[in-house]
Structures are given as structure tokens and as C-alpha cells.
């Protein structure tokens, strides 16, 4: 019997635009997922999660792709397609940074609730981009959830001086949507904390 070797890894990209986010990039193909997690009729506090991905030299990455997974405002994942259709909440978004003139990701969602009593509201993020051999996992916590963040078991695994790299900053201005700013830094002194999952 022949023993086969594992297929070698290669950098993840630049297939994203055409294969995973075609509508966002203007291709005549339907995207399976969009940057919208919560439709306008979904329950909860509607917010925008906005940010950029920076490489190790501090340059904005124009061709990264990010995926976001979260619960709704009540701490629940959608249970079925019917649940998604009725609630307007998918729990998942995919967005490329090349779809915005400033190379930002902009996700329309609702602020997540708690999944469990000891977990702070958060959004799971997967980052894929050129130059990395596998995707990177991180989380977004919220700066206006200080008490919940202080008790979160996952956030408490991170050294205190690094936790700020996981916390989105709220920007609420009258008459405008609430925005949480969260930048992903792939390397360097302010590198975002990534999880080995």
C-alpha cells in the first residue's frame, strides 16, 4: 500500500474576490454570504463593525477576506433557514477589504448578547489574506462592556497588556448609526491577539 503525503499548504489567496465574494467585487456571480449579518428588521441594537487589516509594515491590506460569526442580541445562533428568514439574522458575514475605497471591512449587524453568563458579548473573526499559510482566528469584544469583559474566561487568558487588541471602540454620534471600530494588525508591536483553535 502506498502512503500518500499531505498536500502542501499554500498561501490563502487571492482567490477570495472571484470565488468567495463575487458580488461584492462586481462579478456576475451570486455570493453565498454578504457583509450583512442582520437585516433592518432583525431585533437588537443595530451597529456597524468597521475596520482595516494592516500588514507587518503597517500598510493597509487591500485584498484580505474576513468572516464573522456571532449570536443575536439575545445570545442565540439561528436554528434553521426558516429562523434566518423570519428573524433577519444570519449569524455569519463574509467581506473582502478590496470592496471599499479605503480598504475597510464594514459589517452590518446587531450587537451580540451573551452566549453564557460568564462570556462577554463578542464576535468571532477569521482572517484570510495573501502571505499567510492558514487563516487566523481572533475575537472582537466591545469597549462599553467593561464588567463583562473583565469576567470573560477567554479574554482573561490573554495578558492584560494585550487585551486592547481585541476590543472594538464605540463611536456613537447623534443621527448616525452606531459604529464599533476594530482594526486587525497582523504583526508588529500592536499585533492583534490570534487564537490557536
UniProtKB/Swiss-Prot annotation:
**What reaction is this protein's catalytic activity?**
3,4-dihydroxybenzoate + O2 = 3-carboxy-cis,cis-muconate + 2 H(+)
Which positions, given as ranges, span the membrane?
none
The pathway is: Aromatic compound metabolism; beta-ketoadipate pathway; 3-carboxy-cis,cis-muconate from 3,4-dihydroxybenzoate: step 1/1
Q: Which residues bind 3,4-dihydroxybenzoate?
A: 130
Which UniProt keyword terms apply here? Aromatic hydrocarbons catabolism, Dioxygenase, Iron, Oxidoreductase
Is this entry keyworded Iron? yes
Cite the GO molecular-function annotations of the record: ferric iron binding; protocatechuate 3,4-dioxygenase activity
Q: Which domain of life is it from?
A: Bacteria
State its cofactor.
Answer: Fe(3+)
Q: How does it assemble?
A: The enzyme is an oligomer of 12 copies of the alpha and beta chains.
State the similarity comment. Belongs to the intradiol ring-cleavage dioxygenase family.
Please give the function described in this protein's UniProt entry.
Answer: Plays an essential role in the utilization of numerous aromatic and hydroaromatic compounds via the beta-ketoadipate pathway.
Q: Which NCBIfam families match?
A: protocat_alph (TIGR02423)
Q: What is this protein called?
A: Protocatechuate 3,4-dioxygenase alpha chain
